[in-house]
Amino acid sequence: MPLGISKIERLEVYCNQEKVGVLALTHENLCAFQYDAAFLQNGFSISPFHLPLERKVFVAKPNPFSGNFGVFNDSLPDGWGSLLLDRYLKKNGIEVDKLNKLQRLAIIGSSGRGALEYVPDWSITEKATTHDLNILAKDAEKILLTKYHGNGLDILFKNGASSGGARPKVFLKIKNEEWLIKFKSSADPPNIGKTEYYYSILAQQCGIKMPLTCLFEKRYFGVQRFDRNATKRIHTISAAGLLNADYRIPSLDYEMLLRACFLLTKNMEEVLQLYRIMVFNVAIGNKDDHAKNFSFQFENGQWKLSPAYDLLPSSGFNGNHTTTINGKGTPDEEDLLIVAKKIGIAERTACSIKKEIYALCRK
């Protein structure tokens, strides 16, 4: 990435070396996207509800992603990753406020989550390098609490600038496997890593599909990346990106999310898996269940629910679930069954899932 950011008129979008289409900006500073002709013949809709596979120019709405499409906004960092990116760019003399959406996507380039990549590619990444997690954790804390811009900033940027969420994190390759490793934020309790690891194991016991998780150095929670496999990257879109839903505020109800899951996957087993996640979130008090904490993946010609992530107790908005249950931010167990009935899950099945999960979570 050049230190003097150049002007970009258009940005090419790729998925596993195949050109998907082209992004540009309108005079109103809205993103415009058009699929590539070859991709129209052989590809798939990267965002079925908002970018169907059609030969036309799509123009993004001003909200909720400031004139970007949700699927491309997913590539951009938020929270910790955004702080890292802005701090790193300022350190290198780049005026962050003057960057447009295309330039920010070019900075992410090939380093983003999921399968989408952007050309020109200005990304700077560092792969297959081992770092001392304790040192990285201390540097992350300095970045959060001070204006620190030492060598640790460069290392964390190269290994985590595309990440989302509030907590500091890095992508590292360990024994030829790619991991996302989290550190504690200034607001977290000291044992946050152990807590998240415990709930990741509990979620698996509750029948929820999770990526492989690990507690590094007995304190840092790690999750194996599920947007990659040995041969390719896997196209991944968050519920926020899929539904054009604002993840920063309450904007979804689980009924809407479950219906979208069925419309997208056409598979009731995927709906039941998402229902399990809803019940688990209510049972453990995970109220930070915003629209970016659910994702879908396209692989082998099929859409599916991604493995679950970010499952641990949290306070949410004023003690309410960010994604409501039967329209309520503070639901009771009966609301879980009402949602099941609304979306066509048999009462016997819903009761069985609820009973199983609550029994495990109350141990």
Where on the chain are the PLM-derived regions?
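Phosphate/dinucleotide-binding and metal-coordinating scaffold of catalytic cores
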Residues: 1-291, 295-363
